[in-house]
Regions:
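Patatin-like phospholipase
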Residues: 1-270, 274
Length: 274
């Protein structure tokens, strides 16, 4: 993202690019800039693009990020949904952080990896959760410097998790073995392990469903309708340092007042990004 789109074709064979500033190599803030992730989030959450209050979604939603400037958690209950999710999954050193005018946001798990408190404050009567993060090493596993450093790095998060767990009615903790946060190629296996663990709670869920039925029929959750197109009032370029705003808008070729569908916008952004 430090190369203008006109020159990116010259870098297609590079495995890694490190910018040089003032005769020094600058280490990036993350191995993955996240453009494809952002594109995917924008694609799947297209129907919710104009919903800025997450309580108005078919199922009310919130997510957490961590501001590394203040070391405090940031609770997203509104805004642009893909941006909120992108910030909440920005694993430090793996994905680049999300920067705002005053904050540098990374994965919320740095401070709070399980948001039972926020769900209760949101009005949840029953909290059902699944925890798949690091649970801490036993004494016998703390025989290496790496293990000790990892344990120290998670001390705050682990202590907070125990507090959040006490606020949970049903907690599902699949046994993941060697699977970790970066096991992107083990999706099917991870889902299968979660499913097997959830089956152990089948009787609990059935009793819970029966107790809820005693309150009468529940309103069905109506999914968002897919949106054919949006009409932009204005188009503004921010954070640009490499080429003129006019060039960017020219390549984007999307004008205020025109109907813009998802495929067209994704195609133009891909072209612009190079």
């Amino acid at each position: 993202n430090k190369i203008i789109f006109l020159e990116k074709r010259h870098f297609n064979n590079s495995l890694l690019a490190l910018p040089v500033t003032r005769n020094a190599i600058k280490i990036p803030s993350g191995l993955i800039s996240g453009q494809q992730i952002e594109s995917g989030l924008n694609h799947y959450f297209w129907p919710a693009a104009t919903i800025t209050d997450f309580s108005e979604l078919p199922i009310p939603f919130l997510c957490l990020a961590t501001d590394v400037v203040t070391s405090k958690k940031v609770v997203f209950t509104g805004g642009y949904l893909p941006d909120a999710i992108r910030a909440s999954i920005a694993i430090p050193s793996v994905f680049t952080p999300v920067r705002t005018d005053t904050a540098v946001l990374v994965d919320g798990g740095v401070v709070r990896n399980y948001a039972a408190t926020e769900l209760r404050e949101m009005g949840a009567d029953i909290v059902i959760g699944s925890y798949v993060s690091f649970r801490g090493y036993k004494e016998k596993d703390l025989g290496t410097a790496y293990g000790i450093l990892k344990q120290i790095g998670f001390l705050s998060s682990l202590a907070d998790y125990e507090e959040q767990k006490r606020l949970t009615d049903i907690m599902i903790e699949p046994e993941l073995g060697e699977v970790n946060t970066l096991s992107f190629n083990n999706i099917d296996s991870i889902i299968a392990r979660g499913y097997r663990e959830a089956l152990k709670y089948r009787d609990v869920f059935e009793k819970l469903a029966d107790s809820l039925d005693s309150y009468g029929p529940r309103e069905p959750v109506i999914p968002l309708h897919d949106v054919m197109y949006y009409i932009f009032d204005t188009i503004r370029v921010t954070g640009n340092e490499l080429i003129s705003d006019e060039q960017i808008i020219g390549v984007l070729n999307v004008r205020p007042g025109e109907n813009v569908d998802r495929d067209l916008l994704e195609e133009r952004i891909e072209l612009l990004y190079g």
